[in-house]
């Protein structure tokens, strides 16, 4: 996930910040407890496509580009 894209994407429901879960290929909104899927490298930012996220799940940070 491109960090520049992640900086401008927000949750479509609450407009809150999203966190990238590389392992699950999802964008997580902690405020709404929703996980938006990333399919073929494209974030699907539709509320109908989101699933309930797992509370307390630890998300490993994405490695910086070039590492």
UniProtKB/Swiss-Prot annotation:
An annotated GO cellular component of this protein is: cytosol
* Organism domain of life: Bacteria
Give the residues annotated as coiled coil. none
Q: Where is the signal peptide?
A: none
Show the SUPFAM superfamilies listed in the entry: Trm112p-like (SSF158997)
Q: Which family does it belong to?
A: Belongs to the UPF0434 family.
HAMAP family in the cross-refs: UPF0434
Can you name this protein?
UPF0434 protein RALTA_A0561
Which organism encodes this protein? Cupriavidus taiwanensis (strain DSM 17343 / BCRC 17206 / CCUG 44338 / CIP 107171 / LMG 19424 / R1) (Ralstonia taiwanensis (strain LMG 19424))
């Amino acid at each position: 996930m491109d960090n520049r894209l992640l900086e401008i994407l927000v949750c479509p429901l609450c407009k809150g910040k999203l966190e990238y879960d590389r392992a699950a290929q999802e964008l997580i909104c902690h405020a709404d407890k929703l996980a938006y899927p990333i399919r073929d490298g494209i974030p699907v930012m539709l509320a109908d496509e989101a699933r309930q996220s797992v509370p307390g799940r630890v998300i490993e940070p994405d490695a910086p580009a070039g590492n």
